[in-house]
UniProtKB/Swiss-Prot annotation:
The keyword Iron does not apply. Coiled coil: none annotated. This is Bifunctional purine biosynthesis protein PurH. Pathway: Purine metabolism; IMP biosynthesis via de novo pathway; 5-formamido-1-(5-phospho-D-ribosyl)imidazole-4-carboxamide from 5-amino-1-(5-phospho-D-ribosyl)imidazole-4-carboxamide (10-formyl THF route): step 1/1; Purine metabolism; IMP biosynthesis via de novo pathway; IMP from 5-formamido-1-(5-phospho-D-ribosyl)imidazole-4-carboxamide: step 1/1. GO terms for cellular component: cytosol. GO terms for molecular function: IMP cyclohydrolase activity; phosphoribosylaminoimidazolecarboxamide formyltransferase activity. It comes from the Bacteria. Belongs to the PurH family. One of its GO terms (biological process) is 'de novo' IMP biosynthetic process. The IMP cyclohydrolase activity resides in the N-terminal region. Its EC number is 2.1.2.3, 3.5.4.10.
Amino acid sequence: MTKRALISVSDKAGIVEFAQELKKLGWEIISTGGTKVALDSAGVETIAIDDVTGFPEMMDGRVKTLHPNIHGGLLARRDLDSHLEAAKDNNIELIDLVVVNLYPFKETILKPDVTYADAVENIDIGGPSMLRSAAKNHASVTVVVDPADYAVVLDELSANGETTYETRQRLAAKVFRHTAAYDALIAEYFTAQVGESKPEKLTLTYDLKQAMRYGENPQQDADFYQKALPTDYSIASAKQLNGKELSFNNIRDADAAIRIIRDFKYRPTVVALKHMNPCGIGQADDIKTAWDYAYESDPVSIFGGIVVLNREVDAATAEKMHGVFLEIIIAPSYTDEALAILTNKKKNLRILALPFDAQEASEVEAEYTGVVGGLLVQNQDVVKESPADWQVVTKRQPTETEATALEFAWKAIKYVKSNGIIVTNDHMTLGVGPGQTNRVASVRIAIDQAKDRLDGAVLASDAFFPFADNVEEIAKAGIKAIIQPGGSVRDQESIEAADKYGLTMVFTGVRHFRH
């Protein structure tokens, strides 16, 4: 019995060659629309879909394959006489191979000038229906949705006259992933169009970006996926100019680094980071000096760290960085001379370029945190704050220099793991106290790191002080200015302690926990 294939693709890559090989193997080919035109033009004989259905394509191609003669040919079980008899009685010929890919919905909605009508028109109906019918009946039908699978199908057909069950099952699984992702993207688009912020069903679709050697630890398997609709300012979209493949921990740290620097837009800034905590932030009138400040913040912890710069890397800055062992450097761009310096004898140094002008768009997407049996969803902590809204709660007002330093410190503390404390001046971090289970311990760690550099220093806390003992420790160290959210039932005790020691303290009214 002559075998039949149905081919209807939007992506024509490789389809003519695939169809030519099928014809050599004696297959009949049913085709539709533009695919039929392409195959006929290449000399591949095809059967028009309306010759199979008895109905013309209609409604601008919206209705062409949704017909019992198509789906009966796909769904009929070859092992059931009743199915085969029903097909025969209704003049339904069996279809053994389906090659379909779908209307380019993703590519359409990514166009900057796309209209809602264009998006709707590029929702495929018949294609997913054929794919799902064929995949359901994979015991008998081979289904191909990805041109990358053409070769293996042809190899098996040439060798055995049919594909193996294992191949058909694998391809069916691929189809169900593909159609699920396609529908998820449509659902995401429509959800955004109607402004639904808390959908009762959450559908997400990501594409495999990188199969990883391992995860956070060698005993953990891991992979890296990218959003189906990519975010330009993201590690997933970064252009890698040099170095080894990014590891799991590299990606998490690099993501934290590029989030931090989004808050330092207006002056040249360098952020150094280790284990998702900033270990040095420097700000200056030029990027080379900003590097100096970031490095001087903690010359020990920066070893093996990640550095992100918000200005082009020039040769002078590259020379300074070249002398320090770093895992990753991230910047908007690099001069040719800077790249030559950084890559000299450092083939493993990972160098990434990112479009910093796309930072604002990256702040919109939600954050997803997996928990056992569930998923937490929240928007990013990107609230826009103004010092004009802050409240000085002590008798002493900050000096102009202290006010500048407090603003710098408040930007920096946002990304320190809770309980988080940071000590800074007006242009660099001096001490970081991250992740302690009691706040006074974080205060002591940050102050200890900053010792001998506390003249003119200020301190920021990511959340309120539960007791006045924090202020006591700060005053004892000689720090004269504090910024924190406020909000404790014992705020007045902390205020009184600050007044007692002549400190100035600012309440922002905004907490920045980070876990």
